[in-house]
Structures are given as C-alpha cells and as structure tokens.
Amino acid sequence: MHPFQWCNGCFCGLGLVSTNKSCSMPPISFQDLPLNIYMVIFGTGIFVFMLSLIFCCYFISKLRNQAQSERYGYKEVVLKGDAKKLQLYGQTCAVCLEDFKGKDELGVLPCQHAFHRKCLVKWLEVRCVCPMCNKPIASPSEATQNIGILLDELV
C-alpha cells in the first residue's frame, strides 16, 4: 500500500513536495470502509446487546424474588442495615441451623422471626406457618397489609 493512497497519489499528505495541484480526499462511501470499521460497529452492537441482556436478567430475578415475598407474606431484608434494627446479628436460622452472616438475604415474617430467604421460601412451600412459633402466615391480601405495617415500623 502506497503512503499516498489516502491522498489520491499527491504529496500533500506527507508535506514532502510543494505542488500546485490541489489535493483533496476522495469522498468515502459506506461500502469503501475498511473491514476493521465493520468489526468495531458489530462488536459495539454485540456489547450493547449483551449489556441489555444482563440488565434484563437482573431485573427479572429481582421481580421474581419480590413476587415470592408477596406470595408467602414475608419482608425481604439484607443483613446489613435492617438487621441492626431487628437485632439479628449472632442469631441462627431455625431452618438450616446456620448463623446469619453479613450481606445474607433474609426473610422476616410478620411475627418478626427472620430466616435465610431461600430457607424460608422452601419452608413456606411445604407449610404456611412460622418455623419458630408455628403462627400461621396470613393470606396474600393480609400479608401485603402486614408488610406495609412492618416497613413503616422499620423506617
């Protein structure tokens, strides 16, 4: 490839020889673009697609978790901020018998007993009572009201 090819064969591109001939770039159409430009455009499109796919999966999983908590009537907390108000540090999950650790996702029932969220969902699929006190869990309409009351109490 000649170094002058991009400048229509004249020396203006390198500034080596002064010439009276006017030098201008030829118009470039989309079909004349080099292959690497197509690769950049294609790669950017794939990147944006993958990023949007990741966001969609994240929001779908969040919606699924929210639907489970509304279905079974428990409030979801992360053992970080809300756990201090509920005094959950050092306690044990009654379902799996493991201690609560930092950033664990917990489910808090209307009776104020807390469990790991996954443990609680499995328990509530089998029995609709609290694993600690055997208090029945309210129906979904009552559970929504109870969750609102619990949220107001925690804030």
Swiss-Prot record:
Highest taxon above the source species: Eukaryota
Residue spans, zinc finger RING-type: 93-134
Statement: the UniProt record of this protein carries the keyword Lipoprotein: no
Expression by tissue: Widely expressed in several tissues and cell lines.
TM regions (residue ranges): 40-60
Topology relative to the membrane: Single-pass membrane protein
Pfam families listed in its UniProt record: zf-RING_2
InterPro entries for the chain: RING_finger_E3_ligase, Znf_RING, Znf_RING/FYVE/PHD
The species this protein was found in: Homo sapiens (Human)
Task of the protein: May induce necrosis and apoptosis. May play a role in cell viability.
Lineage: Eukaryota, Metazoa, Chordata, Craniata, Vertebrata
Statement: the UniProt record of this protein carries the keyword Cell membrane: no
Protein name, per record: RING finger protein 122
UniProt-annotated location(s): Golgi apparatus; Endoplasmic reticulum; Membrane
GO cellular component: cytoplasm; endoplasmic reticulum; Golgi apparatus; membrane
Principal subcellular localization: Golgi
GO terms, molecular function: ubiquitin protein ligase activity; zinc ion binding
A Gene Ontology biological process term: protein autoubiquitination
Keyword line: Endoplasmic reticulum, Golgi apparatus, Membrane, Metal-binding, Transmembrane, Transmembrane helix, Zinc, Zinc-finger
